[in-house]
Amino acid sequence: MNASQENLWPAPFASKSLDATVVVPGSKSLSNRYLILAALGHRPVRLVGLLRSRDTELMMDALRSLGVRCEIDEQVDTTVTVVPPSDGRFHGGTKVFCGLAGTVMRFVPGLAMFADGPV
């Protein structure tokens, strides 16, 4: 054993098997990506456990401006149903406010390419 190994901290471990459920908080980055993927579909998608943050609100607003419905569950606000435009095309002739949301700035221009007019 060398000198650096002698100073290692021994990690704790369970003395027996564990059976537990852990609720992990939502991820802003993943939540925005799920919203985009749902918007690209052909039918409504129900997202459960979505992180509600300024960035995800900006993403939902951007999608709404493109004609996507984002319906927030009245009972559980982390459940959102995303309904793509019924005609399958994103709507143009609109402006998108990105705020400081990098995911919105990176991904929405790609979606705008599929719009039926300038965005």
Predicted regions and their residues:
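Short, structured segments at the rim of ligand-binding sites
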Residues: 1-119
